[in-house]
Amino acid sequence: MAATLKSLKLLRYQAFCSPSAFGAVRSVSYWNASSTQHGGQDPPGHISLCHSAKKVKNICSTFSSRRIPTTSSARPGLEFSKTSSSKASTLQLGSPRATGIDEENVEVFDSFENLRVFLQLRPEYRVHSYSASETSQLLSVSEGELILHKVRVNQNNLQAQVIVDYLCKLSSLPAEQHPVLLGSTSFALLCQLSVRKIKLFDTQDLINVLKAFVILGIPHSHSMLDVYETKCCHQVWEMSVDQLLLVADLWRYIGRKVPRFLNICCSYLNLRWKDLSLSQLVHLIYVIGENRQVSQDLMQKLESLILKYIDLINLEEVGTICLGFFKSKTNLSEFVMRKIGDLACADMQHLSSHSLVNIVKMFRFTHVDHINFMKQIGEIAPQRIPSLGVQGVMHLTLYCSALRFLDEGVMNAVAASLPPRVAQCRSKDVAKILWSFGTLNYKPPNAEEFYSSLINEIHRKMPEFNQYPEHLPTCLLGLAFLEYFPVELIDFALSPGFVRLAQERTKFDLIKELYTLDGTVVIECPDYRGNRLSTHLQREGSELLWYLAEKDMNSKPEFLETVFLLETMLGGPQYVKHHMILPHTRSSDLEVQLDVNLKPLPFNREATPAENVAKLKCEHVGVSLTDDLMNQLLKGKARGHFQGKTESEPGQQHMELENKAAVPLGGSLRNVADKSGAMEMAGLCPPACMQTPRMKLAIQFTNRNQYCYGSRDLLGLHNMKRRQLARLGYRVVELSYWEWLPLLKRTRLEKLAFLHEKVFTSAL
């Protein structure tokens, strides 16, 4: 494999290392301060040092008010300047917190040291990680000037080991001199010489030079580092696991992603994974997570190692493992997640808030409902939230909504803590928090203050929403679930300009979100006169959502049986229509229409062949409720109600409410029979005698994912749908999972009787 890599990279490697690439050494500064930054991105496909040198600006102007001559006669004393040092100290290029980063990495860099706390908890980590606390004997300014003088004088005769030694020594200069050193053309020359000699560096040389780069704050976007990554790629198979992890850690400290290097590391570790120690395992997962790069095959092997060491892992390491798997978008099995939940619950009071948030992220990602963990979150989170960073609060809130876990204490603490510090929120935080409250269909006691502060923050952050357009529809839908409709923002979100921006700038398809928003505002804001989604996009959204809903429902045998039983009870498929009454609400319904006599109408023309329409007569079809059939149905009255048990969430029996018995058939069915005489069901009338429906029923086949966890409270989207159906004159008939699913095991007559009760009692 190493040979293959070498052959693939050889041409590029030679281009970087060829001495002919440095013809512009003395005329142009080496540093590319204005180049495109690589933070969070893959390095460019090909970068020539010579080409880079020809187009870059001289970084000396950033750090020093004068140019430094590069001839061998230049006085060493001119290299360092107290005044230029004070000017240069305004920016530390090497600090991760000073580098340009995209939104998704803000949290990573802002909490850089928190992410590395686990490295301080075992001495074994020192062998394969870099610590900023490492110290060496300081080099005086005069000694540094002398080294740079030697570089200029002896540039054609410097050996590889001497170059490495010079770089390491210069990194020992006082910190305030580092920016001045970076502005020195002599130091740029030294770095160029290091690239020229890099083929002669061994693994330890590479490590020492990378450490020097970390200390000095070499810009992570510098093209020279691409040469070093290539060298690291060639060196992988000569490294030990400890050296491999240390090199990866140094790249992390520099702030540059090195995908080629990590790909080869994964191949290397796929062969040696069984020999990883606990500290190596945790550190490797950290490195994989921070680089968002993963081999699924390797991650499965690492999961088995987690189980091997599970009893030895401390809580900070648990948080690191969860974060690594979360960032690499890799699942942990339910079994492992329950083990992790048990560890966290055993000592949650001593679990740091940082690790708590990381564990919460992974539970959200895997959708594992660890009941004891959820309970303890409900107890401990309200105490932690006031001191938790805004992004941590967002992740905690999003965890609750993803698992449909409504704990009012947690949500109230979030709502109380946010208004005073809402300015600290990113657009992403505002969006996810509003979405979470809306999804759980929960208004906190301070709803007015809470929502006004967040809506105002949306207005203030409009430039950021333009940069990350996917967050604006999320905000507005979260608000719409709870009947908040900021018209100006909705008008902007549905404007052609923003829709076009959303399609161009985001990797997410926002048509579903915008279509849901568009359909909602039409029904709930009749006076709205703002922008609407184009007809083309409305049709596209409708077709997409119907395809998904139809595919989902038709894959459920219990739903198909329900449709068949309704058709049987009412008289045929023309009396029932499976469609999306409100396409923008993302779920389908079974529609039934009743006339003034509460008899079903054959309104579903799609289910009636055209050649048969003319033959339809007002003849009775369907099931006639004769005295014998009524007696059979009513026999169960003496035995009491059906005892169908609710299917509960996994392991949540003690959280579920008491199961209600199914609706009794006796009295109510008699009442229906009394009101409708013989109660012969469903007379089929031809179109000529079709009546305007007195009542339109939306029969909804629900499941537990439409309710808050362990309760019968609808989630925001489904509650909004029922609200809108009512506005349009529909009466919702709910076939709830806790009633209907147990009944599917009963006889056909019992199912028909239950459906009859549901349909016709709702009409009364």
From Swiss-Prot:
The keyword Phosphoprotein is assigned to this record: yes
Pfam families given in the database record: FAST_1, FAST_2, RAP
Localisation: Mitochondrion matrix, Mitochondrion nucleoid
Region Disordered, annotated ranges: 68-94
Record key words, sorted: Acetylation, Mitochondrion, Mitochondrion nucleoid, mRNA processing, Phosphoprotein, RNA-binding, rRNA-binding, Transit peptide
GO biological process assignments: mitochondrial RNA processing; mRNA processing; regulation of mitochondrial mRNA stability
Entries under InterPro entries matching the protein: FAST_2 (IPR013579), FAST_kinase (IPR050870), FAST_Leu-rich (IPR010622), RAP (IPR013584)
PTM sites of type N6-acetyllysine: 507
SMART domains per record: RAP
GO cellular component: mitochondrial nucleoid; mitochondrion; ribonucleoprotein granule
Listed Polar residues bias regions: 81-93
Residue intervals of the RAP domain: 697-757
Modified residues (Phosphoserine): 95
PROSITE patterns, per database record: RAP
Molecular-function GO terms, alphabetical: rRNA binding
Extent of the transit peptide: 1-27
Function description: Plays an important role in the processing of non-canonical mitochondrial mRNA precursors.
Quaternary structure note: Found in a complex with GRSF1, DDX28, DHX30 and FASTKD2. Associates with the 12S mitochondrial rRNA (12S mt-rRNA).
Family: Belongs to the FAST kinase family.
Protein name as it appears in the record: FAST kinase domain-containing protein 5, mitochondrial
Gene that encodes it: FASTKD5
